[in-house]
Amino acid sequence: MASIDKIAPEHYQERAHFKECCIYQVYPASFCDSNGDGVGDVQGIISKLDYLKDLGVDVIWLSPVYKSPFVNNGYDISDYHEIDARFGTLADVDELISEMHRRDMKLVMDLVVNHCSDQHQWFVESRKSKDNPYRDFFWWRAQKFSSEGERLPPNNWREEFSTGSAWEWDETTQEYYLHLYCKEQPDLNWENPKLRQAVYDDIMKWWLDRGCDGFRMDVINLISKVPSLPDAPIKNPNDKFQEPYKYCANGPRVHEFLLEMNREVLSKYPDLITVGETPFTHHDFDVLVPYVLPENKELQTIFQFEQQEVDGYPQLVPKDYQLSEFKEITSRWQVEMQKRGGWNSIYLENHDVARSVSRFGNDSTPEYRIATAKLLAAMQCTLSGTLYVYQGEEIAMANLPKDWPIEEYIDIASQTYYAEELAVRKAKSGAPNPDMSDIMNGLQRKARDHARNPMQWDDSPNAGFSLRGDAKPWMRVHDDYRDWNVAKQIGDPDSVLSFWKRMLAFRKGHLSCTYGYYTLLSPGDEEVFAYVKEYKDERMLVVLNFTKDTGSYTLPKEAGDLSNVSDSIGNYRGPLPDLKSGKVELRPYEALVVVT
């Protein structure tokens, strides 16, 4: 087998800020409430900048704070120039940018331009008449009719958050408009050059000129649709509407649009950070890697979802998995990006997924929760790619308690999924209260709600989420906040928070973490995830015990010579285990990183 360094492009190990920085995602409604109204806000974020800087954060990715009706948690934007009143004012964001730059930190904003809100002025104008100048900013199509004369939408596409149509009828102009997400989120028509120029000038340049340092581009691979909008393949004959992504994900002009965006906007602002969200892609490297090849001049990094789907897809239909599956996916992305010269994003959590310590670790006891949270931190911090940490991940925040009822799951995806399934089961069984335990199990394991409850700052009422007053938070605080919070962990050298801080510093001190060529060890081992990273003269061995058992791991010859260890870090106190024998005695959920 050829060694990776013989086939990886030279630019893969070229140093760059966007590769080495630690990016921390802030979900503003749930981060910190400065004014006591129960909703997190921009001033709350400003109040915690020193905490984030001390942790080792270089960049904040700020989820949407724009003016919005909040049908879909702010991703339905009605004004890209205004800040929603619940979060503060434009002056507050200007202050946030200034305070971050003063601390040598950067701000990445969420760019949501596959769709907007139906209350955005563009759409308000668009639906007034068929000859309105903004009509073609969106996808409008005429109705069809069945053989019985029933009005039908233009095609059989299904929207993402329900089993219903991706088309909504508009009475005023007697046509349908396309919405891949909620009906309140009409899709923008990127085929229209006037729309594209408005995005570049009125949104992107407007924010970059205010000091924004880059964009996380929401579902950016959906902006190009096959213009004829053909019917989707029928995957489920029992469903009236079908998954549309064959004709709207990674569409025929998506690379053309992103190249144009780079030429018109991104190339004119040096040192920007760009990352594109690329769902519904079936993990095809030939499709995904071109987005991030430097010579293509599109994006720096992407978010891929294969690792996130190892425990089940669709998201709310969980399944068990073997460690070897998790290792194979992680390793394939490490190696393929190296071979092809692309760049990874490393993450286990964001606002759309459940908590990593509950999914990939073990939160059944405090001891296991601490150990596995540290183990996952060690893994992420030693993989090649741009590292993302989600708020609360650094203190091992866990999934919502299993005794919480469906009413506490307030995300639109959770509520719609539960309501639709309940209606189907009522109709089928005739029972007023059919068994929904399997649906609740899916929500308890993987709902987006788990990432969205308030950040746990201390053990005061509501976890110190509100800096003033005792207003009820917009979402219920986790029951365990008195035991799991920043204040309790920040002074404890053995805490998860302290380990994250040490691990982030370790990553910055050892470039093999970020740039090292990757070799998986023992791929079939269902208990230990081990790999080697190599960068210039530095060689790093990572050994992760993913079980609650003590065991002996035999180091394969690819682990290399371990007789001269120059540095190490692990999630247990005490001296480094003896490695010269070729075996490592591992404690439950032990993580061990050694540098030679």
Segments (PLM) and residue ranges:
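Active-site and adjacent substrate-binding regions of carbohydrate-active enzymes
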Residues: A2-T596
